[in-house]
Amino acid sequence: MHLTKSEQQIMEIFWQADHPMAQTEVIHTCEDRKWKERSIFSMLNSLMAKGVLREVGFVRSGKTYARTFEPAISHAEYLALVVAEQLPAKQFPELLASLLQRVEIDSE
């Protein structure tokens, strides 16, 4: 699964949030990136098409309703998918051993 850098940044916002978010909230959260509203709309639709984001409901936004979204997969699940695409399956045990060793070092 490949996400563009911008899509990854959008997903980081969702992974860090503790609640479903509407497009307007995403826009306010990433004002420093100077993305256009239409670009964010396109990225949200792309992320849903890729299966990493899902629509979960609606909230009142002014006089209309806005869709709300949440991650369909966790950040860890996404990273596992990326690694699985890049690493041959026969190297998974070595990867897991390296990760466990890293956890042991970090916890000391």
For each predicted feature, which ranges?
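Short alpha-helical segments that sit at the start of domains
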Residues: 1-13, 17, 74, 85-89
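Alpha-helical hairpin
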Residues: 3, 35, 105-106
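Short, cationic-aromatic polyanion-contact patches
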Residues: 3-6, 58-80
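Short acidic, hydrophobic short linear motifs in intrinsically disordered regions
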Residues: 20-29
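Short amphipathic alpha-helical interaction segments
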Residues: 34-49
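A short, conserved structural fragment
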Residues: 48-60
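Amphipathic alpha-helical dimerization/coiled-coil segments
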Residues: 76-108
